[in-house]
UniProtKB/Swiss-Prot annotation:
Domain tr-type G: from-to ranges: 2-184
Role summary: Required for accurate and efficient protein synthesis under certain stress conditions. May act as a fidelity factor of the translation reaction, by catalyzing a one-codon backward translocation of tRNAs on improperly translocated ribosomes. Back-translocation proceeds from a post-translocation (POST) complex to a pre-translocation (PRE) complex, thus giving elongation factor G a second chance to translocate the tRNAs correctly. Binds to ribosomes in a GTP-dependent manner.
NCBIfam families linked to this entry: lepA (TIGR01393), small_GTP (TIGR00231)
Enzyme class: hydrolase
EC number(s) reported in the record: 3.6.5.n1
Gene3D superfamilies: 3.30.70.240, Elongation factor 4, C-terminal domain, Elongation Factor G (Translational Gtpase), domain 3, P-loop containing nucleotide triphosphate hydrolases, Translation factors
Membrane topology: Peripheral membrane protein
Compartmental location: Cell inner membrane
Gene: lepA
Protein name in the entry: Elongation factor 4
Biological process per Gene Ontology, one example term: positive regulation of translation
MF terms (GO), sorted A to Z: GTP binding; GTPase activity; guanosine tetraphosphate binding; ribosome binding; translation elongation factor activity
Reaction equation(s) it catalyzes: GTP + H2O = GDP + phosphate + H(+)
């Protein structure tokens, strides 16, 4: 066990994690040069295209160190984006060390800090690495200073490297061996292995990625998952060197995969503990009694309705969501019926990027045509009878008379940016009802801390932040509490009928403005009908904005040449009566764009 090192790489988006992982794999001979592709561990097309890492991947490598010993290194790649911080904490809890990669030309950014604190909380040894040293604008001294100021770990011996040219890779590997402690655990004890990740494979069923903590797991063993108490046979074991390499057994301290003929992913919950059942011996000596401390169940922060464009596609959408959930433990969904859109699902996501990626994967990998409603967050509603309910869907909030108060989720937001953009960012944060808590200067970087309602961030805060700071600002946020706030539900009515999927929750101070904006937008989108269509925005029974789409009408008096006015009036009255009848029975088609229009109402 002393020759095993488990480590992962943490960094902000685009600081070069995946390229560094490629170099390390190449240096340890995990892949021949001809198989080397950029970003080996990003296996999803979407990951390569967006240049981000979504799922954690692993590689088991052998490295001959300068002291002549051969070490087994397990590298676990982690995502850098704030929405996937959960994937990061899972990867880190399987490691003893982490390489903190900082772009020497950019310095410390928000997710670097967030992920680094996660690592320090889990007691992982952090080794700072300065990447992109080949760039002419690299400023290693400044970057070291920032690491010490902002994160507070000693960066005097930070390793300079360049993942692009391959400089400093050996130094990194030597540092991992020297500074990262070997795994602790009892190789002779009862088997305990933690599931770090699990995904579904069409041929073999569920594949579990496990980190063996105590004991050993051999091929053919009967295993039990402690949380669900389900039992299986370990049919195949192995490690990824990024390729799959079958093994006869996995020892304590190793990270590898187990295939046990599990049919549904719900059985192999991430964070569960795997242990042995020995046939015939009562299984006591080999079965662990105490599970490993797992992960906290992750709570989705952002909700949106996903509906199929054709009602007949409902079943295939459900299958697609089930399959996606196999690979993505943090996706939540439940069936929902909307009067406007028919049958669909209410889905919970970790954040906006996560939502976009789920939508894109549904459309790409599963060929779904989707209608998505505006994203919303969870509100706590204190009803007049004292009951507290959590509401994910704005249209489900009870009428104003039955509600004592609505509490909205407040998050603590950390914003990092160069000094020049502080003013613009502060203006933006105040617009979004942010309350400034703190402001700190670290060299040329400024860190602002705000409390903001999550509902304000969900719509477009991130995009706006990037545009006011020319892309230099970065952010991360964490949930703080639910707090009572003067928010109201704005309903959109078409000809007096509520369209439930268009309800939005906004702060009272912005309600009239948002109502007007949405109504005006809807007027542009809904096509003209044979009768007048009134589009109204209402808070309860109080109408705050209205637009009318005028009816298309035939010129009924074209056939009268001259003649009496009463003849013309008769025809016009007759037309009017017909339109009135039509309006009573006519229904208005709401096009798909209307649901997205709510998102694009400009501030």
């Amino acid at each position: 066990m002393n020759h095993i090192r488990n480590f992962s790489i943490i960094a902000h988006i685009d600081h070069g994690k995946s390229t560094l992982a490629d170099r390390i794999i190449q240096r340890c001979g995990g892949l021949q040069d001809r198989e080397m592709s950029a970003q080996v561990l990003d296996s999803m097309d979407l990951e390569k295209e967006r240049g981000i890492t979504i799922k954690a991947q692993t590689a088991a490598l052998k490295y001959k160190a300068r002291d002549g010993q051969i070490y087994n290194l397990n590298l676990i790649d982690t995502p850098g984006h704030v929405d996937f911080s959960y994937e990061v904490s899972r990867s880190l809890s399987a490691c003893e060390g982490a390489l903190l990669v900082v772009d020497a030309s950019q310095g410390v950014e928000a997710q670097t800090v967030a992920n680094c604190y996660t690592a320090l909380d889990l007691g992982v040894e952090v080794v700072p690495v300065l990447n992109k040293m080949d760039l002419p604008q690299a400023d290693p001294e400044n970057a070291k200073q920032e690491i010490e100021d902002v994160i507070g770990i000693d960066a005097t011996d930070a390793i300079p490297c360049s993942a692009k040219t391959g400089m400093g890779i050996d130094e990194i590997l030597e540092a991992v061996i020297a500074r990262v402690p070997p795994p602790k655990g009892n190789p002779d004890g009862a088997l305990r292995a933690m599931i770090i990740d699990s995904w579904y494979d069409a041929y073999v069923g569920v594949v579990m990625l496990v980190r063996v903590v105590d004991g050993r797991l051999a091929k053919g063993d009967r295993i039990k998952l402690m949380a669900s108490e389900a039992m299986y046979n370990a049919e195949q074991l192995g490690v990824f060197t990024p390729h799959t390499e079958p093994r006869q057994s996995l020892e304590a301290g190793e990270v590898g995969f187990v295939i046990a003929g599990i049919k549904e992913l719900q059985a192999a919950r991430v964070g569960d503990t795997v242990t042995l059942i020995k046939p015939g011996t009562g299984g006591a000596a080999f079965t662990a009694t105490q599970a490993l401390p797992g992960f906290k169940e992750i709570q989705p922060q952002v909700f949106a309705g996903l509906y199929p464009t054709e009602a007949s596609e409902y079943d295939s959408l459900r299958d697609a969501l089930e399959k996606l959930k196999l690979n993505d433990a943090s996706l939540h969904y439940e069936p929902e019926v909307s009067q406007a859109l028919g049958f669909g699902f209410r889905c919970g996501f970790l954040g906006l990027l996560h939502m976009e990626i789920v939508q894109e994967r549904l459309e790409r990998e599963f060929d779904q045509d989707l209608i998505t409603t505006a994203p919303s967050v969870v509100y706590e509603v204190l009803k007049a009878d004292g009951e507290i309910i959590k509401v994910e869907n704005p249209s489900k909030i009870p009428d104003a008379g039955r509600v004592t108060e609505i509490r909205e989720p407040i998050v603590t937001v950390h914003l990092y940016m160069p000094q020049d953009y502080v003013g613009a960012v502060m203006t933006l944060a105040n617009l979004k009802r942010g309350v400034q808590l703190n402001m700190a200067y670290h060299g040329k970087q400024v860190m602002l801390t705000y409390e903001m309602p999550l509902g304000e961030i969900v719509l477009d805060f991130f995009d706006k932040l990037k545009s006011v700071s020319r892309g230099y600002a970065s952010m991360d946020y964490e949930f703080k509490e639910f707090r009572a706030s003067d928010v109201v539900k704005v309903d959109i009515l078409l000809n007096g009928e509520k369209v439930d999927a268009l309800s939005i929750i906004v702060h009272r101070s912005q309600s009239a403005y948002r109502g007007r904006a949405v109504v005006a937008k809807m007027r542009e989108i809904i096509s003209r009908q044979q009768f007048d269509v009134a589009i109204q925005a209402a808070i309860g029974a109080n109408i705050i904005a209205r637009e009318t789409i005028k009816a298309l009408r035939k010129n009924v008096i074209a056939k009268c040449y001259g003649g009496d006015i009463s003849r013309k009036r008769k025809l016009l009255e007759k037309q009017k009566a017909g339109k009135k009848r039509m309006k009573q029975i006519g229904s208005v088609e709401v096009p798909q764009e209307a649901f997205l229009a709510i998102l694009q109402v400009e501030e």
